[in-house]
């Protein structure tokens, strides 16, 4: 998607970044455990987090093994019930404590104006 009101697209750095394993990322996150307390944890957002669903599954499974709560912040644009993707999504949901589902607009026509995409798969995900 390319939403009309996306925060600071002029600051995006599409190239670069630092690749990390799930364990490396969790080791970094755990440095803040005293800040988030017993019920806190990690939130994965985007861009669109579901574009990296295999990594999310690994990350959230390992987070749960460490008693870290998990939150997925998503527009659910990639959501589909087709093929193996839905099986992966179900596996991810088993280790996701909270989902923040960002529906840009409930009406199809208004959603298209804002994002240039349909909201049908997003609403399907919400079901």
Label each residue range with its predicted role.
Residues 1-20:
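Canonical Radical SAM [4Fe-4S] cluster-binding loop centered on the CxxxCxxC motif
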Residues 5, 21-23, 77-79:
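A short linear-motif detector with a strong N-terminal bias
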Residues 26-34, 38-41, 46-127:
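Conserved AdoMet/S-adenosylmethionine-binding subsite of the radical SAM
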Residues 18, 24-27:
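SEC14/CRAL-TRIO lipid-binding/transfer domains and related phosphoinositide-recognition modules
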């Amino acid at each position: 998607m390319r939403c009309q009101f996306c925060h600071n697209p002029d600051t995006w750095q599409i190239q670069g970044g630092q690749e990390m394993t799930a364990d490396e990322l969790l080791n970094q996150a755990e440095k803040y455990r005293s800040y988030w307390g017993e019920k806190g944890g990690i939130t994965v957002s985007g861009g669109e987090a579901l574009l990296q669903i295999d990594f999310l599954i690994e990350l959230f499974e390992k987070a749960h093994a460490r008693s870290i709560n998990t939150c997925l912040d998503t527009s659910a644009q990639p959501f589909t019930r087709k093929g193996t993707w839905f099986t992966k999504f179900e596996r991810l949901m088993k280790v996701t404590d909270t989902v923040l589902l960002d529906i840009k607009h409930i009406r199809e026509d208004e959603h298209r104006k804002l994002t240039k995409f349909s909201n049908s798969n997003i609403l399907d995900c919400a079901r």
